[in-house]
């Protein structure tokens, strides 16, 4: 029983150390692995056509456009 507690504590300490030493991009990646995701859209790093922008980003050739309904922007295909 003591070994299991020690092993768990060691695992937690190592995980926290990695988070402290990691740069911002790695922290975001690790936090996404650690935290359970509530919605499938949160798993994406960019917005898809007709969906809200994710951190101001849209997938592919889509553009983040601020509209009346979406103050933070919605991803739309823009004609060249």
UniProtKB/Swiss-Prot annotation:
Disulphides: 46-59, 53-64, 58-75
Keyword Metal-binding: no
Residues recorded as bearing Pyrrolidone carboxylic acid in the entry: 44
Signal peptide (residue range): 1-22
Transmembrane domains' residue ranges: none
Residue ranges annotated as propeptide in the record: 23-43
Superkingdom of origin organism: Eukaryota
Keyword field: Disulfide bond, Knottin, Pyrrolidone carboxylic acid, Secreted, Signal
Tissue-level expression: Expressed by the venom gland.
Function: Inhibits Kv11.1/KCNH2/ERG1, Kv1.1/KCNA1, Kv1.2/KCNA2 voltage-gated potassium channels and Nav1.7/SCN9A voltage-gated sodium channels. In vivo, no toxicity is observed upon intracranial injection into mice and intrathorax injection into crickets.
Entry protein name: U10-hexatoxin-Mg1a
Organism: Macrothele gigas
Record lineage: Eukaryota, Metazoa, Ecdysozoa, Arthropoda, Chelicerata
């Amino acid at each position: 029983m003591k070994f299991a507690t020690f092993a768990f504590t060691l695992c937690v300490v190592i995980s926290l150390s990695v988070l402290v030493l990691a740069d911002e991009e790695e922290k975001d990646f690790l936090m996404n692995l650690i935290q359970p995701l509530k919605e499938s859209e949160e798993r994406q790093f960019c917005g898809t056509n007709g969906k809200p922008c994710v951190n101001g980003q849209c997938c592919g050739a889509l553009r983040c456009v601020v509209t009346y309904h979406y103050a933070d922007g919605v991803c739309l295909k823009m004609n060249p």
